[in-house]
């Protein structure tokens, strides 16, 4: 039964990757979206002993994009950070969003880091180092950001610090 569940999960993941709808781009408050995600995960942060910080410059950032798709990307990156911090006594996750000529969003954690030999592979569909999950998450995130004419990269990853960087046009 476990194997059939994995096949179903794989099929569902493949369907998501291959049928990603075109983004419905509308003006929305990125700041409000980030605050909603903080609220959504606040119980998980508390339960996992994770300190979460959110900063936006300017205080309110508006952007054009598919709010649902971008929320999914941010939620996936936050959940990955939380998984990286499992068992850590003083976990920290921060999001720093900035608007100037473009929008940049950095999601940072103080987890173990991603080994250099895996940093290119983590965006490949179905690649995973976890016992659970399909390995589709980061690939899907990268594809969604690309559909918004943006880029998702690992800005830095060392033991004690990983930063995922999203760069998008206004």
Language-model regions: role of each:
Residues 46, 51-61, 98-100:
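Conserved catalytic submotifs in the C-terminal HATPase_c
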Residues 137, 141:
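Short alpha-helical Gxxx[C/S/T] motif in the catalytic ATP-binding
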Residues 20-23, 62-65, 129:
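Conserved micro-motifs of the catalytic ATP-binding
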Residues 30, 113-121:
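Short helix N-cap motif at coil->helix boundaries in the Bergerat
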Residues 1, 24-39, 96:
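A conserved beta-strand-to-alpha-helix junction within the catalytic ATP-binding
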Residues 90-101:
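Short beta-strand/loop element within the Bergerat-fold HATPase_c
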Residues 145-146:
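Detector for a conserved hydrophobic position within an alpha-helical segment of the HATPase_c
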């Amino acid at each position: 039964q476990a194997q059939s569940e994995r096949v179903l999960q794989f099929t569902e993941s493949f369907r998501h990757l291959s049928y990603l709808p075109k983004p419905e781009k509308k003006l929305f408050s990125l700041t409000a979206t980030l605050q909603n995600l903080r609220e959504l995960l606040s119980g998980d942060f508390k339960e996992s002993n994770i300190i979460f910080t959110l900063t936006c410059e300017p205080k309110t950032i508006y952007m054009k994009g598919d709010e649902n798709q971008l929320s999914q990307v941010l939620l996936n990156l936050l959940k990955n950070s939380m998984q990286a911090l499992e068992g850590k006594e003083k976990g920290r996750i921060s999001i720093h969003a900035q608007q100037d000529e473009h929008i940049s969003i950095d999601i940072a954690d103080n987890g173990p880091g991603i080994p250099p030999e895996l940093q290119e592979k983590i965006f490949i569909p179905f690649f995973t180092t976890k016992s659970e999950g399909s390995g589709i998450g980061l690939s899907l995130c990268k594809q969604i950001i690309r559909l918004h004419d943006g880029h998702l990269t690992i800005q830095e990853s060392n033991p004690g610090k990983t930063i995922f960087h999203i760069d998008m046009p206004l």
